């Protein structure tokens, strides 16, 4: 159960950092299909 909790926290942290990184480096020129992921 502890391993599952660590895995969940790792995935959540990964997606949060990915979201923050994409928000800070919001460049429509590099991401032409960004509106489709909305």
Curated annotation (Swiss-Prot):
InterPro entries: PSII_PsbI, PSII_PsbI_sf. It holds the Pfam family PsbI. GO terms for cellular component: chloroplast thylakoid membrane; photosystem II reaction center. It comes from the Eukaryota. One of its GO terms (biological process) is photosynthesis. SUPFAM superfamilies: Photosystem II reaction center protein I, PsbI. Disulfide bonds: none annotated. It is found in: Plastid, Chloroplast thylakoid membrane. The chain crosses the membrane at residues 4-24. It is a single-pass membrane protein. One of the components of the core complex of photosystem II (PSII), required for its stability and/or assembly. PSII is a light-driven water:plastoquinone oxidoreductase that uses light energy to abstract electrons from H(2)O, generating O(2) and a proton gradient subsequently used for ATP formation. It consists of a core antenna complex that captures photons, and an electron transfer chain that converts photonic excitation into a charge separation. PSII is composed of 1 copy each of membrane proteins PsbA, PsbB, PsbC, PsbD, PsbE, PsbF, PsbH, PsbI, PsbJ, PsbK, PsbL, PsbM, PsbT, PsbX, PsbY, PsbZ, Psb30/Ycf12, at least 3 peripheral proteins of the oxygen-evolving complex and a large number of cofactors. It forms dimeric complexes. PANTHER family: PHOTOSYSTEM II REACTION CENTER PROTEIN I. Belongs to the PsbI family. This is Photosystem II reaction center protein I. It comes from Chlorella vulgaris (Green alga). The gene is psbI.
């Amino acid at each position: 159960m502890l391993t599952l909790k660590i895995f969940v926290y790792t995935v959540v942290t990964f997606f949060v950092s990915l979201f923050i990184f994409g928000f800070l480096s919001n460049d429509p020129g590099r991401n032409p299909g960004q509106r489709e992921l909305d």
